[in-house]
Amino acid sequence: MISMILLNITNSLLYILSILIAVAFLTLLERKLLGYMQHRKGPNLVGPMGLLQPIADGLKLITKEATKPTMSSPILFTLSPIMALILALTSWAPMPMPTPLTNMNLGLLFIMAMSGMFTYAILWSGWSSNSKYPLMGAMRAVAQIISYEVTLGLIIISMAILSGGYSLMLFTETQEHMWLLLSSWPLAMMWFTSTLAETNRSPFDLTEGESELVSGFNVEFSAGPFALLFLAEYTNILFMNTLSTMMFLNPGMTNPQLFTINLMTKTMILTTLFLWTRASYPRFRYDQLMHLLWKQYLPLTLAMYLLNTSTSMALCGTPPQ
């Protein structure tokens, strides 16, 4: 019994450590990629080819003094970055690699619940700073995330109808012979754009509009708390791209030994697309952002959901439960 508990704790810690290392080097990849796109080198001084830059950045942030605004709410100000990172890491629990930490029947719904909870961390961090710029950034972020969760939820339901359930292991079995991307590419395109908005990435980075809001909801955070918020943001980016790969480009279980490498290679390709988008597109206006969702994506996703449901029922094609 004790050995099983120790094994589970060790597995969880190794899982978390692997994610955090991946996130650290994702920041380096972003800086390098943006550097080359702007005809410069990017980080190249710390370690060979700048490979130790994320470690140096992390050490610098940890050793700095964390300042708190005098009029801030101290408890929420301290708790919100911790909560943000905990939620971002907890979302990975049902993800098969190829075996998940917890094989949930409703894994996708759990992920949506964690994503919804993340809005509280953002709202707390903006409100507890007791400053107008973080509060405006937090309000924008919450409005944006809640709005785009509508589309993400409808797409998840549509994909669950095609695969036969909300378990991510089912998606692996469904895509043994053919990716779901081929049969539902309009949903995949809308999903990719919605994940950009959900993770507050360019061109939907209205929460961090540098020219308007200084840095958004994390303006007043420095040192360790800022590092936690930063890690949470990039953990979410990596997670959303892993989820996209699981739902639309799943490697299947034909080669379980190569499953993780296959999955993470596709995830890195999608993440590179995120970074490429950041380098290429200007920021959307707020009204354009909302218009895109409520007047274009919502009717389309509803139509695709009804099509998938009616087709499955008409052809008796709903997979057995």
Swiss-Prot record:
EC number assigned by the record: 7.1.1.2
One Gene Ontology term of the molecular function aspect: NADH dehydrogenase (ubiquinone) activity
Membrane-spanning segments: 9-29, 75-95, 106-126, 151-171, 177-197, 219-239, 256-276, 297-317
Reactions this protein catalyses: a ubiquinone + NADH + 5 H(+)(in) = a ubiquinol + NAD(+) + 4 H(+)(out)
Classification via Pfam families: NADHdh (PF00146)
Signal peptide span: none
Topology term for the membrane: Multi-pass membrane protein
Keywords: Electron transport, Membrane, Mitochondrion, Mitochondrion inner membrane, NAD, Respiratory chain, Translocase, Transmembrane, Transmembrane helix, Transport, Ubiquinone
The UniProt record lists the keyword Membrane: yes
Alphabetical GO biological process terms: aerobic respiration
UniProt main location, coarse: mitochondrion
GO cellular component: mitochondrial inner membrane
Location in the cell: Mitochondrion inner membrane
Family from the record: Belongs to the complex I subunit 1 family.
Role description: Core subunit of the mitochondrial membrane respiratory chain NADH dehydrogenase (Complex I) that is believed to belong to the minimal assembly required for catalysis. Complex I functions in the transfer of electrons from NADH to the respiratory chain. The immediate electron acceptor for the enzyme is believed to be ubiquinone.
Protein name (Swiss-Prot/TrEMBL): NADH-ubiquinone oxidoreductase chain 1
Organism: Lycodon semicarinatus
Species classification: Eukaryota, Metazoa, Chordata, Craniata, Vertebrata
Gene name tied to this protein: MT-ND1
